[in-house]
Amino acid sequence: MALYRSDPYSIMDDQLFSNISIFDMDNDLYDMDKLLSSSTIQSDLEKIEDMESVFQDYDLEEDMKPEIRNIDCMWPAMSSCLTSGNGNGIESGNSAASSYSETGAVSLAMVSGSTNLYSAYQRSQTTDNTQSNQQHVVNSAENMPVIIKKELADLDYTVCQKRLRLSGGDKKSQIQDEVHLIPPGGSLLRKRNNQDIIRKSGELSGSDSIKYQRPDTPHSLTDEVAASEFRHNVDLRACVMGSNNISLTGNDSDVNYIKQISRELQNTGKDPLPVRYIPPINDVLDVLNQHSNSTGGQQQLNQQQLDEQQQAIDIATGRNTVDSPPTTGSDSDSDDGEPLNFDLRHHRTSKSGSNASITTNNNNSNNKNNKLKNNSNGMLHMMHITDHSYTRCNDMVDDGPNLETPSDSDEEIDVVSYTDKKLPTNPSCHLMGALQFQMAHKISIDHMKQKPRYNNFNLPYTPASSSPVKSVANSRYPSPSSTPYQNCSSASPSYSPLSVDSSNVSSSSSSSSSQSSFTTSSSNKGRKRSSLKDPGLLISSSSVYLPGVNNKVTHSSMMSKKSRGKKVVGTSSGNTSPISSGQDVDAMDRNWQRRSGGIATSTSSNSSVHRKDFVLGFDEADTIEKRNQHNDMERQRRIGLKNLFEALKKQIPTIRDKERAPKVNILREAAKLCIQLTQEEKELSMQRQLLSLQLKQRQDTLASYQMELNESRSVSG
């Protein structure tokens, strides 16, 4: 039997293989079957047809697993072939890609005529048809050459076959997975399907050409001892479709869903997604403007009632809420630039003044309405800033469970101004406006007025005759009572409760309330507060010419933290200028009306201001008296502490003769002196103990001597 090597150049001698390359991947290797026909493979073809009838229910185009399972993807060399043809396989030098062809090695029994006792495939061939085919191949082998393709030895497969033979099939399930493991480098691809086999089987039956012997293969189920289902540990769909998870040949439901979503996203003709409609703020403003225009007449009537109620509430609550004069064109600011707390006090005027302004100018009322709207918006914004305020009404604040905060409790004590009057937790809108007016005036006055610290005022001192602190008349540090801060042109002989204006907030840290004055400054542009005084009070202004007064008041003076008592204002000539109440009110009213364009009388203002000042005078008098008493006690404490430091300094030898010594140095030297005296005391105490011990010893010695002397006298006598 002539054996040919698998080298394509050694096979080209025959004209039948002149146009065929065995290792050409593009050509089907089984095209050789048209030229190579043999009667020895009839049994294998019949087995293949039988298996086709069994697996005809499977769709070959849908799933490739049945074909791969029943049709050989690889042709591993069997143990019988590997035993005898291992050397030839290594000589051939074929790589692992040789498993791509579907021609396996011929068994040892077919080549040499001998049988392998351990071959499972030789034991399984018991049919008569197979034996007759084998005998026909042996007899006709001399005439027709047999082409054998050799492969490299698969050591893993050889070991598995040996284990299977030696175990005798007892551990079939355990070795089955090892047998079907795909060796590294093995190919799962195939070059034909079952349809080609069925088509080519008819052509092979009638052709008479070179005999082609197929080797023993593991795909024949009846030839194997225990044929099992062919399974791989790799998903074979990756070899066909390029993915391990997606089946492109399945139903197109997912593809249809994706296409539908893509069309929906690419369709630009549809309306956008419906969302919650948010109207623009301009629509709301238009509605508010229409409503304000429709209710303009009612607001003019309500404005007059609001002013009357405000005046009554101000009189009852003891607050001075007289409006500041409107500014001129040069001093006016834009509505946007005005502070929100100014809007509440800017729209309130006297009854006659409001009537005149409404009848003469309708634009003023519209501006006031706009200011009210702006103020309400600002207050709503203020509601979200803090959780507690004295200046907000009840309906705008949600205090939750009404828990008492530290600012509501009685634990908050004002040391400077302790009084029995307490503000309500949530005042009404009118009280809120009054408080805002007062606080804004206080802040604006403090910032706008440039006042000297000490300026022409007297410091009356209440002598504390009952104080245990000794007098400091002989001290080098006299008290403020004996040394006023600055000489004044005229002094107040006595203290009068009604002589002090009541416009201060109770929590102010100044020792006496500052007298409010109607001031306008050419260098300071802004709004100034004006207040009306009682008859007999003095008015102080900054560069303001008043009718009926010949002299010009130089400037206003504010009370400092250490001042108390009645304020006296010096003029340029050094004399005071008392002005009557009527002249004062008329001058200010005329000034207001000249700037606002209205004409108002001062009769109603006079009566309301008088009532306010009388009520506020008695209330503030008690508060000022308590504040003065507290300041006196504090002053006495400071004087007593100063005297104690002076006495301590006299006891220290190192700084006794110094005229001035800081308190820190006095304390440091006193500490050193105390330590020195303590050490001296300890030394003296130890010395006393030693001396007492020596005295005791000497007394004992003296007593012993006396006893001896007495004994000697008694013996001699």
From Swiss-Prot:
<keyword id="KW-0539">Nucleus</keyword>
<feature type="region of interest" description="Disordered">
    <location>
        <begin position="462"/>
        <end position="535"/>
    </location>
</feature>
<feature type="modified residue" description="Phosphoserine">
    <location>
        <position position="220"/>
    </location>
</feature>
<feature type="region of interest" description="Basic motif">
    <location>
        <begin position="625"/>
        <end position="638"/>
    </location>
</feature>
<dbReference type="GO" id="GO:0005634">
    <property type="term" value="C:nucleus"/>
</dbReference>
<dbReference type="GO" id="GO:0042023">
    <property type="term" value="P:DNA endoreduplication"/>
</dbReference>
<dbReference type="GO" id="GO:0045943">
    <property type="term" value="P:positive regulation of transcription by RNA polymerase I"/>
</dbReference>
<dbReference type="GO" id="GO:1990381">
    <property type="term" value="F:ubiquitin-specific protease binding"/>
</dbReference>
<dbReference type="GO" id="GO:0045927">
    <property type="term" value="P:positive regulation of growth"/>
</dbReference>
<dbReference type="GO" id="GO:0046622">
    <property type="term" value="P:positive regulation of organ growth"/>
</dbReference>
<dbReference type="GO" id="GO:0010506">
    <property type="term" value="P:regulation of autophagy"/>
</dbReference>
<comment type="subunit">
    <text>Efficient DNA binding requires dimerization with another bHLH protein. Binds DNA as a heterodimer with Max. Interacts with ago. Interacts with lid. Part of a complex containing lid, Myc and ash2. Component of a complex with pont and rept. Interacts with puf. Interacts with wh/wuho; the interaction may be mediated by mei-P26 and may be involved in the regulation of ribosome biogenesis.</text>
</comment>
<dbReference type="GO" id="GO:0008286">
    <property type="term" value="P:insulin receptor signaling pathway"/>
</dbReference>
<dbReference type="GO" id="GO:0003700">
    <property type="term" value="F:DNA-binding transcription factor activity"/>
</dbReference>
<keyword id="KW-0597">Phosphoprotein</keyword>
<dbReference type="GO" id="GO:0035363">
    <property type="term" value="C:histone locus body"/>
</dbReference>
<dbReference type="GO" id="GO:0000978">
    <property type="term" value="F:RNA polymerase II cis-regulatory region sequence-specific DNA binding"/>
</dbReference>
<dbReference type="GO" id="GO:0031670">
    <property type="term" value="P:cellular response to nutrient"/>
</dbReference>
<feature type="modified residue" description="Phosphothreonine">
    <location>
        <position position="217"/>
    </location>
</feature>
<dbReference type="InterPro" id="IPR050433">
    <property type="entry name" value="Myc_transcription_factors"/>
</dbReference>
<dbReference type="GO" id="GO:0005737">
    <property type="term" value="C:cytoplasm"/>
</dbReference>
<dbReference type="GO" id="GO:0045945">
    <property type="term" value="P:positive regulation of transcription by RNA polymerase III"/>
</dbReference>
<dbReference type="GO" id="GO:0032991">
    <property type="term" value="C:protein-containing complex"/>
</dbReference>
<feature type="compositionally biased region" description="Low complexity">
    <location>
        <begin position="489"/>
        <end position="523"/>
    </location>
</feature>
<dbReference type="GO" id="GO:0010628">
    <property type="term" value="P:positive regulation of gene expression"/>
</dbReference>
<feature type="compositionally biased region" description="Polar residues">
    <location>
        <begin position="351"/>
        <end position="360"/>
    </location>
</feature>
<dbReference type="GO" id="GO:0032869">
    <property type="term" value="P:cellular response to insulin stimulus"/>
</dbReference>
<dbReference type="GO" id="GO:0055088">
    <property type="term" value="P:lipid homeostasis"/>
</dbReference>
<dbReference type="GO" id="GO:0061060">
    <property type="term" value="P:negative regulation of peptidoglycan recognition protein signaling pathway"/>
</dbReference>
<keyword id="KW-0805">Transcription regulation</keyword>
<dbReference type="InterPro" id="IPR011598">
    <property type="entry name" value="bHLH_dom"/>
</dbReference>
<comment type="similarity">
    <text>Belongs to the Myc transcription factor family.</text>
</comment>
<dbReference type="GO" id="GO:0030307">
    <property type="term" value="P:positive regulation of cell growth"/>
</dbReference>
<dbReference type="GO" id="GO:0016072">
    <property type="term" value="P:rRNA metabolic process"/>
</dbReference>
<feature type="region of interest" description="Disordered">
    <location>
        <begin position="555"/>
        <end position="584"/>
    </location>
</feature>
<protein>
    <recommendedName>
        <fullName>Myc proto-oncogene protein</fullName>
    </recommendedName>
</protein>
<dbReference type="InterPro" id="IPR036638">
    <property type="entry name" value="HLH_DNA-bd_sf"/>
</dbReference>
<dbReference type="GO" id="GO:0006357">
    <property type="term" value="P:regulation of transcription by RNA polymerase II"/>
</dbReference>
<dbReference type="GO" id="GO:0000981">
    <property type="term" value="F:DNA-binding transcription factor activity, RNA polymerase II-specific"/>
</dbReference>
<keyword id="KW-0804">Transcription</keyword>
<dbReference type="GO" id="GO:0042594">
    <property type="term" value="P:response to starvation"/>
</dbReference>
<dbReference type="GO" id="GO:0003677">
    <property type="term" value="F:DNA binding"/>
</dbReference>
